[in-house]
Amino acid sequence: MKRNYQLVFLSAFLLWFAWPPIPFSSPILLIALVPILLATENIIGAQAKKKGKLIFRTAFLCFFAWNTASIYWVFNSLDSAMPTWVAALISLIPFGLGAVLMTFAFWLYYRLRLITSKVWSYAGLICFWIGYEYLHQSWDLAFPWMNLGNGFAATHQLVQWYEYTGVYGGTLWVLLSNILFFEIWQALKAGTLKMNKTRLILPTIILVTLPVLISLFIYFTHTEKSNPANIVVVQPNIGPYKKFGSMPPSEQINRLIHLSDSVGQSNTEYFIWPETAISQGTEEKTFREDESFKTIQNFLNEYKNANLISGIESFSIYDSAATVTARYNKNSGIYFDVFNAAVSIENSGTLQFYHKSKLVPGVEQTPFSNALSFLKPAFAAFGGATGSYGKQDEPSVFYSQSGIGSAPVICYESIWGEYVADYIKKDAQFIAIITNDGWWGNTSGKDQHLHYAKLRAIETRRWVARSANTGISAFINQRGDIVQRSKWWVQGALKQDINLNEELSFYVRFGDYIARGGSIGSGVFALILIIALLKKRKF
């Protein structure tokens, strides 16, 4: 068993080392699962009882160690905002739950090995893993941060074909490569590698090199159609606790305007401010009466074509429980929703609102709110930083007076490829990501979040204009290159002429088809396992 534990921790180390933001290491993902496959094979071939439990335990150790090492910053961000025990409990969602789901994929692979061939078992492993990833981006505890395909974000030149497959193409590439390298290792140990050159070595070489060559060809031949628009992104560098505490909202607005003016041009189409840049809590119906709106309107009047996209903490009031998330105020007898939102303000005074749809489990929404409604008072006690926010069911596009369509993507939403693609289907010509990464501190979390934005640019072939409150703000072109970026925790503003794009990539048109296929496959293999179990028990 000691040997097996060494193997699983080796896999955990390789997975961590290959993960963003460590540069140039992502190809290691293509072999990182070989040690855990070896450990699993050792247990299957051993004279031991309760092999299933052993496989589950060893696999869980591997994936829990990898998840914790890669996204340790989740606890950091929560611990500073709530009691440590609550932060630790919520941190288990990304640390532990993801690891459990990954482990089940390996355990189900083991169960298939007992009743079918190795080849079909490998097919089952691929389907179970992809099915787990799709589940983990679709339910109330969604956290698709650790999907294997995301691991190539730091070396985006290698996965330009994500415009056809999305990140699930990367997941499939990683799983197939690891299986073939594992089979090569097994043949090498058995002394049969020479007689299996055609069956193993040639397919492995093709599988590893062909996607890279195709990607590099796309990368170096991709040209953007000229359709320029001048965009400004602003980084006010206001600490997240200062923002909601000691710094008056009017002072924050004045800083944002000053930074915007420092780089704005007569032809600037959009100024983009970060998540909750307008932070005082504003009723949407009466926003035009707010002093912040009037100040912003005066600023925009200085620019002929100017529009502003800004994060805003807003609320709506109802006479009845109009939404599932509506809260009731006993003193005033009204229902209301609070939103982590984006607002588009034109210099003509036209307003458009978008309510963040992908909410952070436990922090912005109570997971499975009907079943866990008893936790709502605990989350609500943390005020504006936590609790159940209102949301909208699908993305909506902001349109400027000149007809430009923009995708307002708020923070966490930027890790959903298909969700961002839905904006593009609705005629978004560029992506505006607004975020407040200061909660995480100076950790790898902020860097991972930035790198993932590169994947959205590739999938959709759209420029990304990224405004972060404390960093890192950036412009990313259609190939996923970071053209400009700010420093962490520094005030500033960036301007860039970007090329708007109206064409739809294959991935935008068809979305996560690989994930849906894998999910169907996992259902078929799960049914096979159930039938085999029923036959064994003679039910």
Segments (PLM) and residue ranges:
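Generic structural signal for well-ordered alpha-helical scaffold segments
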Residues: 41, 109, 113, 182, ...
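Short glycine/proline- and acidic residue-enriched helix-loop micro-motifs
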Residues: 90-95, 238-244, 379
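Membrane-interface segments at or immediately adjacent to transmembrane helices
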Residues: 154-160, 207-301
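Solvent-exposed soluble domains appended to multi-pass membrane proteins
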Residues: 248, 273-539
